[in-house]
């Protein structure tokens, strides 16, 4: 199973969980049983959160941390779903192991820009969302960018670990800097067109990059945009998109109650400012 398929299953699980944990747990458990080796740390975390009772939750965490040597960001193991385990000695031991592994990962983690040299006329830079990585971004965007050779697909991976094998972005004044630096570094490499695509938190990093640095691209594609930059810098974002003459495209699920309002907000103000902007949802 491809990682993107696991992500799709987890998204479906979240939707089912809104109606009830037992149904969501059974759905995910059935999917896992079909191909156990195809699922990673995030699936085990979901199963632990959705499990019926602390014993079952602990079993999934033990399998993830003790048997598979995975780890999680400390905050996620402090979730309310694990309240019944907060004083459990076995749980605290597993959490301590996970926390130590997380600290070790943070100490040596650096941002990764996949670009090595110009290999096509056009460049597409993909920015992953939280609990993802550069490989996931490449797999998600490759079907859209295509493999005809017209576009060179590259990625930027955050320096901030989220969990075992995954990374995250922070909505602050520094997390976006690798994205900005990556865009700036290829602006004068002779590409005919440079496009950037982000998913969820990756969209916010792209907007921060073009707003707070000289970074520029011809096209910004924002998929399911979670963009808290709008809370304090909406006017700056609109001004920069207009001044730098960048085309803006939004894609979002019609039932996405978190991201669609943000997409509509930025679409409205950029459209009013005369920017080349498109919003599609389904």
Regions found by a protein language model. Give the residues of each.
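Alpha-helical protein-protein interaction scaffolds
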Residues: 2-97
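Gly/Ala-rich beta-loop-alpha elbow adjacent to hydrolase catalytic centers
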Residues: 198-206
């Amino acid at each position: 199973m491809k990682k993107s398929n696991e992500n799709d299953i987890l998204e479906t699980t979240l939707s089912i969980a809104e109606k009830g944990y037992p149904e969501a747990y059974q759905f995910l458990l059935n999917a896992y049983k079909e191909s156990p080796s195809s699922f990673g740390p995030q699936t085990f975390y979901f199963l632990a959160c959705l499990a019926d009772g602390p014993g079952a939750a602990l079993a999934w965490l033990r399998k993830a941390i003790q048997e598979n040597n995975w780890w999680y960001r400390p905050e996620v193991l402090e979730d309310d779903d694990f309240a019944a385990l907060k004083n459990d000695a076995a749980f605290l031991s597993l959490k301590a192991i996970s926390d130590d592994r997380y600290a070790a990962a943070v100490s040596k983690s650096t941002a990764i820009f996949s670009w090595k040299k110009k290999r096509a006329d056009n460049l597409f830079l993909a920015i992953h969302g939280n609990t993802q990585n550069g490989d996931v971004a490449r797999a998600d965007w490759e079907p859209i960018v295509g493999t005809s050779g017209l576009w060179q697909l590259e990625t930027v991976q955050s320096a901030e670990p989220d969990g075992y094998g995954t990374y995250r972005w922070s909505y602050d004044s520094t997390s976006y800097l690798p994205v900005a630096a990556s865009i700036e570094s290829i602006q004068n490499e002779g590409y005919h067109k440079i496009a950037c695509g982000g998913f969820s938190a990756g969209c916010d990093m792209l907007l921060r990059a073009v707003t707070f640095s000289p970074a520029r691209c011809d096209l910004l594609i924002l998929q399911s945009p979670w963009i808290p930059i709008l809370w304090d810098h909406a006017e700056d974002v609109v001004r920069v998109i207009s001044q730098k003459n960048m085309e803006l495209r939004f894609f979002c699920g019609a039932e996405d109650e978190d991201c669609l309002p943000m997409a509509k907000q930025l679409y409205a103000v950029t459209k009013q400012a005369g920017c080349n902007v498109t919003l599609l949802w389904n």
